[in-house]
Regions:
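Di-metal (Zn2+ and/or Mg2+/Mn2+) metal-binding site signature of metallo-dependent hydrolases
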Residues: 78-101
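Histidine-rich, glycine-flanked metal-binding segment
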Residues: 23-33, 37-81
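Histidine/acidic residue-rich metal-binding segments in metalloenzymes
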Residues: 157-168, 193-361
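Divalent-metal coordination cores built from histidine and acidic residues
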Residues: 95-218, 255
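Divalent metal-coordination and catalytic microenvironments
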Residues: 35, 55, 75, 86, ...
Length: 361
């Protein structure tokens, strides 16, 4: 980035009817003028111009050159594009290339494939099942998923090639999900609480290895009991034992790239937080084995409001012991919780919702 802002415009001289004119040629494609720049480094916000050529910022400061397009940013904040690390746009991008509503809020890059739910790897006979998983977990209609995607891939790498060929208004990356990987290898057995055999773990690791080699940003899993199949059972991977999770961590470690993302099982935290601490310690061990970071959802719990503080303290302990844990939080539109058109209120109903569930509208 060129912070020396004294880049002067070129000039063009021409004559019309004896008069001589000098017209400045634009030095930049875009100049954003006079905004308060918050650059994401922790530096103090400052008033500055930002000049852009092509897809690169080429000057920040008092830019003297002109732009083909000039944007008046006075009384506005100018920032780099935000990265939304937790989305489920895996299907939506096929019919909504700008990735709304993420793009409406300054987000220019999204990460998909969270919570273990992805559309690859997939066998032909399992296409409908993976669509049902996304509907059940993330409230995205199965019919839209089946009709909106071509489903002409089988590996995660082929799915990434499909994404690469789409016209897109945002940058896109994705993680390979435990649900698809486990179901691909184990089928119906993937839903049971019994641990996978070593042969099954090896087969799953081959699929994860293919995904990471092809450009996946990491591996995701769901351990929370809130994520259910359409018939009410916890989704594949929920009951995977530590050995299985460590095997996936080892794949990331061999590649020395990728993140391990988890929807943790905090609803079994325990009266003395034993369950919560075990969950975080397991994730900590995953990062120590792999040398790769792990991120997981951590949201406020109205029933146990001190849960977040306990979790953060345990994260601090793990990180001081060589782990690399990065909790993430989220915000949700109020309609997801209070509206009656979604699965979420009913599937996770408290006593108030249950009393309403069978009432006539």
């Amino acid at each position: 980035m060129n912070n020396a802002a004294g880049v002067r415009a070129a000039v063009c001289r021409f004559t019309i009817l004896g008069w001589s004119f000098v017209m400045a040629e634009a030095q930049f494609d875009i100049v954003i003028r006079g905004g308060k720049v918050v650059d994401g480094t922790g530096a103090v916000p400052r008033k500055a111009d930002v000049a852009i050529n092509g897809d690169r910022i080429v000057a920040v400061g008092d830019v003297e050159g002109t732009g083909t397009r000039e944007i008046d940013a006075r009384d506005r904040v100018v920032t780099p594009g935000f990265v939304d690390i937790h989305t489920h746009l895996d299907a939506q991008l096929a019919w909504d290339p700008i990735g709304s509503s993420s793009c409406w809020h300054g987000i220019t890059s999204v990460v998909m494939g969270n919570c273990g739910v992805t559309f690859a790897p997939v066998k032909t006979e399992d296409i409908s099942y993976l669509a049902e998983m996304m509907e059940s977990v993330e409230d995205i209609p199965r019919e839209a998923i089946l009709e909106g995607l071509p489903w002409d891939w089988r590996t995660y790498g082929e799915y990434l090639e499909f994404l690469d060929g789409l016209p897109k208004g945002i940058n896109v990356g994705g993680m390979v999900g435990h649900v698809a990987v486990r179901w691909n290898v184990m089928g119906e057995e993937s839903l049971k609480e019994e641990p996978a055999t070593q042969q099954e773990i090896d087969a799953m690791c081959e699929l994860v290895d293919e995904a990471i080699s092809s450009g996946a940003l990491g591996f995701s899993t769901s351990r929370t009991l809130l994520h259910r199949t359409p018939d009410g059972r916890p989704i594949p991977g929920t009951f995977a034992d530590d050995n299985e999770l460590y095997a996936f961590a080892d794949v990331l470690g061999r590649h020395d790239r990728g993140v391990f993302e988890s929807a943790p099982r905090f609803e079994k935290a325990g009266a003395d937080w034993t369950g919560l601490k075990h969950e975080i310690r397991t994730l900590g061990e995953i990062t120590r084995r792999s040398g790769r970071p792990s991120t997981f959802g951590l949201v406020y719990n109205a029933v146990r409001p001190d849960m977040s503080d306990v979790a953060l303290a345990e994260v601090s302990t793990e990180n001081s012991n060589g782990a690399t844990l990065r909790p993430q939080t989220t915000c949700r539109p109020i309609g997801v919780v209070l509206g009656i058109q979604h699965r979420t209120p009913w599937a996770r109903a408290g006593s108030t919702w249950k009393s309403m569930q069978n009432m006539e509208l």
